[in-house]
Amino acid sequence: MAVLLGGPSLAQTPGGSAIESDSRPPADWALSFNLAGYVVPNTQSYASPTFSADKRKFHFGARYNYEDQHTGSVWLGYNFEAGDKLLFQATPMIGGVFGRTTGIAPGYLASLSWKKLELSSEGEFVFDTEERSGSFFYSWMEFSYSPVEWFRAGLVADRTKAYKTSLDIQRGVLIGLSHRRVDFTTYIFNAGWTTPTMVLSLGFSF
């Protein structure tokens, strides 16, 4: 699959915010690594690692088991932001996808933050270069509230082809904890609609 969450790290993988704030000196790299474990009913569980690196306005990313299982992708994007109290951050991207699914993918990361609230989203459309019917729009969206710096809770929605349930859009709740440069988020999808899917996400930033 995909997280951003945050998880939402610059790549909105599960467990992090959609965009890494640019608080470092311009010459420094901002790095993040996230590992999300998917516990899906009636199928084999799997892990999805993602990595991102940002320098100044440029964003680089790599993902595995994200757009699809046994599939990798690499990304190049450009970061920008606007606002102060109401902060908007976005990264338009272009990616190459290879493996079980192969194609080209324009995508984006975006977040809107105000006080203790954050709305974050990421999406991509994979143009399957081997089979047109395999083209797919992926989306991950979170809305969260952080009463204190180290805790957040909220809602999440996901559309993916990395795993399947009886629902086209997976929906659920999230609870996240963070300490310094480490964060851990639990996502529970589809409780009350079908057998729940759980995602456990551990992220590091450097």
Descriptions of predicted regions:
Residues 16-22, 27, 32-34, 39-44, ...:
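Outer-membrane beta-barrel transmembrane domain signature
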Residues 72-96:
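Glycine/small-residue-rich loop that forms an oxyanion/phosphate-binding "nest" at active or ligand-binding sites
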Residues 61-62:
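N-terminal carbohydrate-binding/catalytic regions of secreted carbohydrate-active enzymes
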Residues 1-7:
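Bacterial N-terminal signal peptides
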Residues 9-13:
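Boundary at the C-terminal end of the N-terminal hydrophobic targeting segment
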